[in-house]
Amino acid sequence: MRHGLYRGITMSVAGSDSGGGAGIQADLKTFAALKVFGTTAITAVTVQNSMGVTGVHPIPPNVIEAQILAVGTDFHVDAVKTGMLGSRDAVCAVASGLGKLGKCALIADPVMVAQSGDPLIEDDAVDALLEKLIPMASLVTPNIPEAERLSGISIADVSDMERAAEEIAKAGCGAVLVKGGHLHDGSRTVTDVLMIDGAIIHFTDSRIDTESNHGTGCTLSSAIAAEMASGRDILEAVTFARRYLRACLINGIKCGHGAGCLAHAVKMDWVDELYA
C-alpha cells in the first residue's frame, strides 16, 4: 500500500547489531533504499563488530510481543520479516504477536549463526520455529546450514537443496527459498532454490568473490519483505530482492578490521523510476 513517498510499511522483528552490518540495522537500511517505511520489534541486543559477537542480551519475550502489537495496532503493516529470535520463548512471543495482527506477508529468516560463526539460537528454538512460526510464513529463507537443521537433510548439492526445501515446506509455509551461497562445490556459480506452489525454481548467478558480505541473509529477507510490501508476489519479490543484494555485494565496503559490509544505499532502477 502506497504511503506518500513510501511503497509500503514493513516491520523487522530481529536483533540489533551494534556494528551496523546485519540485524535490524541492515533491515532498516534496506527498507530505506527500497522506499518502504520501516518499523521494528527488537528481539535482542548483540555486542558485535566486524570481527565477531562478544555478547547477546535477549529482550524479554513479553516486551518483544508488546513491540509487535504497538506497531501493528497503529500502522497498517504490509510485510513483516523475522530474523534472530534466539529462544523458544521469543519465537512463541513473536508468533503470538503476529497472530493478533491483520493479514500481511511474513518472511521468516531462520537466523541461527552469525557470519562470524557465533551461535544465535538455542536448540529448542529450532523446534519452535517449525511448530509456531514457519506455518505462518509466506516464505522461509534458510541458508544451507539452516536448511540442514530445519529439514534434517545433509546438503551436498542442488538436488539436496530441493529435498530440504520440500521437507521444510511440510511445516505449512507458503514457499521456501534455500540459499546456496554456503555450498562450496568448486563451481563459479551460486544457485538458490525456490519451492513455491509445488514447483521448483532455480536462480543461478556467478559467484561474487568479496569479503564484504556481512548481513547478506538479513538484507535479502528484508528486501523481499520490501518488495512484497509494495505489492509484488513472492516470485517477483525474490527476483528483485536478489538483484538488490547482488548490487549491495558488488559495491560492498570495508568499515572495520573483519568482514566488510554491504552497500545498502546502492541505487536500483526500478525504485528510482518511480520517483523520476
Put a short name on every predicted segment:
Residues 7, 58, 235-276:
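Charged C-terminal helix
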Residues 123-200:
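Conserved phosphate/ATP/ADP-binding segment of small-molecule kinases
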Residues 2-12, 32-119:
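Conserved N-terminal subdomain of the carbohydrate kinase-like
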